[in-house]
């Protein structure tokens, strides 16, 4: 669908919608707004739009929980709210949030990453919010916060993270279907 936006910066990873999608060029509180929804917690991820669903990450910093939300694209109704992790939030820049990574969706599953407890946590979920697989990459220290969104390429989910702890980082690929490490 030309109007789908399956990952951060859109279908071509350049922030440009297809001309045939005819996105609105102007909007305000009363113009070109289909629906609005309260988002529990705080997050800086971009909405991901695939088919009849909109996905978004959020974090409740008081309860120290991280969630993936799924909305009905037409109505804005919350279809599900999946708590992914709870507890052990680390240092973060106060201008960042613990839900800055955007969801990536291939139409079959959704993928996202969070940072907490000195770990990068990456998950795959079904379109109904059921956990398919999870990866935990330990030994990370945040300088300004974490915000890298998973990149989908062929059968891979590619993950990247910088690391204040040792000056190194992470660049890895896992299989979309089963989460097995590819490189």
Model-derived regions: residue spans:
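Noncatalytic, solvent-exposed loop/strand surfaces
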Residues: 1-183
């Amino acid at each position: 669908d030309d109007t789908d936006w399956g990952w951060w910066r859109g279908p071509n990873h350049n922030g440009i919608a297809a001309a045939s999608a005819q996105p609105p060029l102007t909007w305000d509180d009363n113009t070109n707004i289909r629906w609005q929804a309260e988002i529990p917690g705080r997050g800086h991820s971009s909405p991901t739009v695939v088919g009849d669903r909109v996905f978004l990450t959020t974090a409740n910093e008081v309860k120290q929980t991280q969630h993936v939300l799924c909305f009905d694209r037409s109505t804005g109704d919350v279809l599900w709210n999946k708590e992914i992790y709870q507890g052990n939030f680390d240092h973060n820049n106060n201008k960042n949030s613990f839900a800055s990574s955007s969801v990536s969706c291939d139409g079959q599953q959704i993928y996202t990453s969070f940072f907490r407890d000195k770990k990068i946590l990456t998950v795959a979920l079904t379109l109904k919010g059921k956990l398919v697989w999870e990866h935990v990459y330990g030994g990370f220290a945040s300088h300004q916060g974490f915000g890298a969104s998973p990149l989908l390429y062929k059968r891979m989910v590619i993950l990247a993270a910088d690391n204040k702890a040792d000056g190194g980082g992470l660049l890895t690929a896992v299989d979309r279907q089963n989460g097995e490490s590819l490189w």
